[in-house]
């Protein structure tokens, strides 16, 4: 027989049914009921459990596990496998600087994080001419040279010491310290802007160290077997009132009680904060005074919010928020580090003012099926001792709404956005209807790649305030988002936008956004500029960004972005026909 024929016969024999190994027809399948404890999901009934042996072998004997079964700690398991420990490598073996094993004792862990955030930006936007001096003495216009370049470096360091388990149970104690080292270099075309003194020139270079976190967190108790808990946190701490930073996102000093219930389905925050004075140029907390009390503003925020997962839809989290802002900064004027008046704002009557405003809000974030959805709505009410243009008490009544819906199509995510903030239609009456936040940092409509959100657009010729502040979406007419007071006599905003994210590769993402912007009401701008009419159409905000992650992680992130505002009639009424734009490069290195 040939070798080929033998191979064919062997293949046929291997493929034929192994009848000799089949169980006899009278062989039954033996099942053994299990009587011991059974793991089950909360709220689900316990069903009968049987083990059925189909291979003709005697079934294994089932029995309960012992009451206590010793399992080695994870760091001992990793060490026994022989992985090397290198402090500079956060991923290999046990790294004591990353909390992989105890730093001392049995359950004291230490964690260090270092982030270098470097940004270079070149931009052109409306820039006022200095009152006393100019780089172009022959110019007659109130709008000067638009060119601006800046380099900003932030070294964010974080040191955490905590006691307790590191998996399911919250730590018993946590001590956190977050110093940030800043260097800023700015060069403008005009004098009298980097500093109020025009002899300071057109360039400013300086550094600053801010404390963005310094707190202790004490775990008070566990309230369920699934580690629902209550904790209290005291000190300088980060806080966000909602999902996207529309109302209040800051690092104030305060006390916060927080916790969870029903297997983390309910979450709550109850807190009282006093805001900290900021460094003018870096925006970081400034506690360089004699003690912390000198650095605290007479500006208090009381916050309560409640989260519920899977409400009203599976995968969608709802939140209700009640936030009160009490401001009593009317004693004396406040001059910022560059010599400019910040409180009260240099607009309208320019009188010191106080206010009490309460925000009642609903926020939601999650998905409904394949549709990703974020919504936010606030109603602000209260009173202020004097309005911006009237030296008399005014009642605050204003609203805000934002929504962003998106859907994934394979490697593409398409987005649609709408934002509405009410404006004041009569700046001389006894009502303030323009919505303003406490300290916003919105993550919507392109966020800081959007021109209108990223840039400080000054109201030239109507007071030393900005139509739209830096990293802010609201047209609030404030001199400074970080140091100024809220202003409820403003033109408001209407935004409608489309955008898309393209995950070209796991390392490369392309994002595009196009937003149409309008003022809600223009009466306050017309009063400030003594100019009428001013059209509502601000223009089209177009932005493009590329994000590259060479390690497919957040350790190295390079971002390039370009944005521009195509002027609408309202923008041209204020600033002329020039098209403002911004180009930036951002590099983040994280350890």
Residue map of PLM features:
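Predominantly the C-terminal beta-signal and adjacent terminal strand-loop region
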Residues: 421, 441, 550-591
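C-terminal structural cap/anchor segments
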Residues: 418-421, 425-532, 536-537
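Membrane-embedded beta-strand positions of outer-membrane beta-barrel proteins
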Residues: 112-118, 175-179, 232-234, 268-270, ...
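Signature for the C-terminal beta-barrel architecture of outer-membrane proteins
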Residues: 226-228, 237-432, 494-496, 503-504, ...
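Residues on the lipid-exposed face of transmembrane beta-strands in outer-membrane beta-barrel proteins
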Residues: 93, 100, 114, 155-161, ...
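Short loop/turn motifs that connect adjacent beta-strands in outer-membrane beta-barrel proteins
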Residues: 82-112, 123-127, 162-175, 220-230, ...
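N-terminal periplasmic/intermembrane-space "pro-region" immediately following the signal or transit peptide
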Residues: 18-171, 410, 414, 426, ...
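Outer-membrane beta-barrel channel domains
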Residues: 37-40, 92-103, 128, 134-280, ...
